[in-house]
Amino acid sequence: MVDRWYNIAADLPGVLAPPKDPDEGESRIALLTRILPSALIDQEFTAERWVPIPEEVREVYRRVGRPTPLLRAEGFERALGTKVHIYYKYEGVLPVGSHKLNTAVAQAYYAKADGAVEVATETGAGQWGMAVSLAAALFGLKATVFMTRSSYNSKRQRLVFMRAYGATVYPSPSEVTETGRRHFRPDHPGSLGIAISEAVEYVLSGERRKYLPGSVMEFVLLHQTVIGLEAMRQLPEEPDYAVACVGGGSNFGGFTYPMLGAKLRGEGFGKTKFLAVESAAAPKLTRGEYRYDFPDATGILPLIKMYTLGHDYVPPPVHAAGLRYHGAAPSLSLLKRLGHVEAVAYGQEEVMEAALLFARSEGVLPAPESAHAVRAVIYLAKKLPPGSVVVFNMSGHGLLDVDAYEKALEWEKIYKHPED
């Protein structure tokens, strides 16, 4: 069992631009101390390479099934007719079906330690909302979740799970907050940016509440490094490529940062390249601008320097709702800017076709978000020479994404198999 998280800040090849306040209005940086547990603020700005995992958090990790397995996708290799070795780290075995529980448990623990009685958050497809709902229940906290309206209407199974864990869930934009009322209309699909603003506003409107972010913040990526640290111990051979999907960056950072950090220090993984895969509906790394922007739609939180499509950008509804975010974590953005991370974007039709191929050859139904990595692996398997090694993070299963697979089966009548 991993006993410490890895912090990429200690090994970054450039200076990570700090958060800053806008020119007008109250200090957003000071606001962080009101909405976040104090330990998380310390972790956000620390330059220490290793951060000890509290024993209480490690115990929950054990109970929910860590370490998760790393598997050879031999059936997928045969289906592709490739001699490339393909491995995947499978986070879908966790109770909520995704990697999101890794940081939800840590954040709920720190919120409880700070005296909170309730936590609030945003969620897209519902994986993060499920994780916070369960983590809150495990630590005796109330949970309130603002779920993007398009997913609230289409991902009903995850909505049921959140409520089963004891959470209160609102469709966002909602009529609960001023932010929600400003954007509200029944057919508005919502966005993670709006949902973040609603969750923060909700926390500020009550007592003993804390906000738990699902991505973008550096401490979220820190907690997720349990994935990559485990994978480094489990891999039988050094990969040529490490691949993961990107919404805000926690999945990609959690999986790749331990390997990338070792490469930057000259301690292994010298040949490994790192590929971030995003949705064509929210292509911040491939089409966004590298600049300061708000991580939320309303501008409640501090400005951070990142690749962004603009905080007012509302991505079109797609099945991979967890990737419908306008920006990427500052550390990931810097690494992409400096050329240490590659990026590619795919449309959902070719992604879901790849997901079906993986399901039929491996028996694992990928979450639509994770399927973006599967699509990229197909490309790499055709591009790389025989004997090359590719590893990717299967960040979650798609057993609660029936709507996405129903549509994929319709698309299959048109599309055969993903092409280069």
Curated annotation (Swiss-Prot):
EC class (word): lyase
Q: A cellular component term (GO) from this record?
A: cytoplasm
Q: Which reaction does it catalyse?
A: (1S,2R)-1-C-(indol-3-yl)glycerol 3-phosphate + L-serine = D-glyceraldehyde 3-phosphate + L-tryptophan + H2O
Q: In which pathway does it act?
A: Amino-acid biosynthesis; L-tryptophan biosynthesis; L-tryptophan from chorismate: step 5/5
Alphabetical UniProt keywords: Amino-acid biosynthesis, Aromatic amino acid biosynthesis, Lyase, Pyridoxal phosphate, Tryptophan biosynthesis
Q: What is its EC number?
A: 4.2.1.20
Q: Read off the HAMAP family from this record.
A: Trp_synth_beta (MF_00133)
Q: What is this protein called?
A: Tryptophan synthase beta chain
